[in-house]
Amino acid sequence: VVDKATFPRDKCCGDGLTTNALRILEHLNFSPHTVPDWKQTHKVIVQSPDGRSVEMDLPEGQGMFAAVAPRRQLDDALVQQCIQLGIPVHQGHSFRSVVRNDADTVTVDIEGLGIVEADYVIAADGMWSPIRKSLEMSTPGYLGEWHAFRQYLSDVNGPAAEDLYVWFDDDLLPGYAWSFPLPNNRVNFGFCMMRNDATSMQFMKKTWVDLFDRPHICAALGNTVVPEDRHTAWPIPARIDNAVRATGRILFVGDAVCATDIMTGEGIAQALETGIAAAHAIAHNDTPSQVRHHYSRTLDTTLLADHRMSKFLGRLLSSPRTTRRVLAIVNSTAWTKRYFVRWMFEDEPRAALFTPRRWHRGFLRRPGAYRTLS
């Protein structure tokens, strides 16, 4: 493993872990105890554009279905797990260029390491992937489908100190604002918006400042909130349907393959899924062409279907009227709230209802992750 960063390091992120992400981490034998500020959450409050709140509870006593873990700590813990497993991890070494990438081998030039030869390269190097750029395969002017702002807040004395909030305000749709609880009365607070002609950076900066004056948000956060450090902003790529997935002996994963959920901007589970899919493709095939085909087919049968569903739902949620109606239906019965919140947190694949091959008897009734810890 080679990374230009030296861990621990901050990472612009909402820090939310869905059920899918939690199950994958458990499958990788990752321990939540290695993340000091890990916080499981049970209550989810979603506010409609008309101001009405939908309160939903994730199952208790059945494992973890949602958690918040600061990426500075989570990523460092994953790096330490790799080191403990005997995996060489080279920190603080930047990628320079691809020297060779053909049917026989792939070699890359790494700062401080020199020329490195490998059977395959899995490029988890972000939306602006330097590896993809080195191969002249980047899209000029591409800025992502979403843009997000985030800041940590302390001294939160409102209900947001314990409960997870999502606000679908009219001017954010199909985006939203969020408050994800952390230990010691801290939260990860932010918002995300889809990029279009009306959402310039100046508009988003103005919106960011305005959020702190909105009464419903102030009511959730309380009246003693203290912003920590500065806010950070980042682009979110969500176009796995037409992103470059692989070339030669190089496979792109995570943000480098634009794998985030286009409806929510969530990407931790997708990064883990694509990384595992790339590793499986390499392990179970003999030739580069077979590896690329296997990897691409895996993405087509899993993430691509979910991407199309999220894209469709995102268009629906662009309308305040439609969003109000959807949330009114969700709030109509205990049954709809119970199953909607599990679907919302990726207890099942986003498009599972329309992909029968992924149906199973325990649909939306499976236990969460880490049952012995919850």
Identify the role of each PLM range.
Residues H280-S374:
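C-terminal helical "tail/cap" subdomain of flavin- and related membrane-associated enzymes
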Residues Q81-L221, N242:
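Predominantly flavin-linked oxidoreductase catalytic cores and closely associated redox partners
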Residues P49-R52, V99-V106, A246-G248:
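A short, glycine/Asx- and small/polar-enriched loop/turn
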Residues V1-V2, A123, V253:
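Generic enzyme active-site microenvironment
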Residues G16, E60-Q81, N196-F203:
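Short beta-strand to alpha-helix junction loop
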Residues V1-C13:
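Glycine-rich FAD pyrophosphate-binding loop
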